[in-house]
Amino acid sequence: MLARHHHPIVAIATAPGRGGVGIVRLSGQRIAPVVQALCGRKLSPRQATYLPFRDAHGQIIDKGLAIFFPAPHSYTGEDVLELQAHGGPVVLQLLLARCLEAGAALDPATGQPVLAQLRVAEPGEFTERAFLNDKIDLAQAEAIADLIDASTETAARSAARSMSGEFSQAVNTLLEQLIHLRMLVEATLDFPEEDIDFLQQADAQGQLLRLQATLASVLARATQGAILREGIKVVIAGQPNVGKSSLLNALAGAELAIVTPVAGTTRDKVSQLIQIEGVPLHVVDTAGLREALDEVEKIGIQRAWTEIESADAVLFLHDLARHDATENPLYAINYIADDARLQSALALKLPKNTAIIDVWNKSDMAGPELLRQVNGGVLISAKTGAGLQALREQLLRVVGWQAAPEGVFMARERHVSALRSVQIQLLTAQNQLQAAVPALDLLAEDLRQAQLHLSSITGAFNADDLLGEIFSKFCIGK
């Protein structure tokens, strides 16, 4: 631990602004003297006590509840004091200042500060203390932040499961199996003179295959959890006036974007967070793609391409009404040719893993013959809502969402990356094990690297810069 981890800390634990209740939290080793100074009495452990909070001159700041959690039975593993007052910003700032003042006051008996080095906590420092004191592991700490930031009910429930340790338990089960396999390899290396084939006797190949199968299951659930956490960026693209804004409004269930018959109405992006089956989607409506008629439209089209290139999925809208060649064949031919050019441009600009869904809009205006000619994609009417459910289902399929919500771990990209690295190391280990003459030293190294990657998920193996990055993302007071 660093020296700062031994300093007592205090912070306002509730969100900024006005509220019915606000909390000031203090954590440190042996904080009983400052508890006495702040509360004017000794508090019974883990019992809420209603009392006045007074300043250094005895004047009442507020009245509320004080709860003392002696170590190690607290959130941080240290002594913790929580002061629950009315949630006004001024009241909470006064209580925070009073805590710092009480800690800095000199003890008449010793002439030393009552609570030396008491300071305001850094973002995430209470949760960091919980991790350092083995109250939670790193995956659980991250799940706490993910629960706070969850944008859908499904994401919140998945984060709660990870916070309770389901993800960590799955990782630890993998670690136990991996360590046992490593022991067999190391025993074979350490005792080559023994007339015992430890690997064959213990069915090392079978153990490795079972480990790989378990890993694949955990990785699949974690990948779905990463989708829940990060969300999916969906960009609506196409020529002007094909119904992009109408589609955004239909998906969002609200009139977010202006809809007019005039081509080029949308000049800048319009974004909205929606959810499909609990999966958060960041849907972006963009300017129509064509040769710009003025400088403002040109900027809007450039921004549209920027959004498209960073999308996880692109909904490319076709206007079925303009495909009808019965009234104006030349207009329809030109429109279809422009659509084809835009589709080619999309294919060239976008990464291969970006999903492109052809969406045929205005199906309510197309005749049966034209509808029969549509090959691939999804038929919809943004105006009537026809086909929207099929579009939602297609969106989830193309981005890889397939797990039942109750089976999903809330996971981060670093977790998924670590699990994939383990998968690669185990595949290399499998090749070594199946060789005619296995290179046991290389096999042992593959398994060691796999263990390091797994351990990084829960923090059993970590780097200080990784910890700093993770906990800095928390709010102050958590």
Curated annotation (Swiss-Prot):
Residues 231-400 form the TrmE-type G domain. Its EC number is 3.6.-.-. One of its GO terms (cellular component) is cytosol. CDD domains: trmE, TrmE_N. Keywords: Cytoplasm, GTP-binding, Hydrolase, Magnesium, Metal-binding, Nucleotide-binding, Potassium, tRNA processing. It is found in: Cytoplasm. Gene3D superfamilies: P-loop containing nucleotide triphosphate hydrolases, Probable tRNA modification gtpase trme, domain 1, tRNA modification GTPase MnmE domain 2. K(+) binds at residues 241, 260, 262, 265. Its main location: cytoplasm. SUPFAM superfamilies: P-loop containing nucleoside triphosphate hydrolases, TrmE connector domain. GO terms for molecular function: GTP binding; GTPase activity; metal ion binding. Mg(2+) binds at residues 245, 266. GTP binds at residues 241-246, 260-266, 285-288. Pfam families: MMR_HSR1, MnmE_helical, TrmE_N. Belongs to the TRAFAC class TrmE-Era-EngA-EngB-Septin-like GTPase superfamily. TrmE GTPase family. HAMAP family: GTPase_MnmE (MF_00379). Homodimer. Heterotetramer of two MnmE and two MnmG subunits. Exhibits a very high intrinsic GTPase hydrolysis rate. Involved in the addition of a carboxymethylaminomethyl (cmnm) group at the wobble position (U34) of certain tRNAs, forming tRNA-cmnm(5)s(2)U34. This is tRNA modification GTPase MnmE. The lineage of its organism: Bacteria, Pseudomonadati, Pseudomonadota, Betaproteobacteria, Burkholderiales.
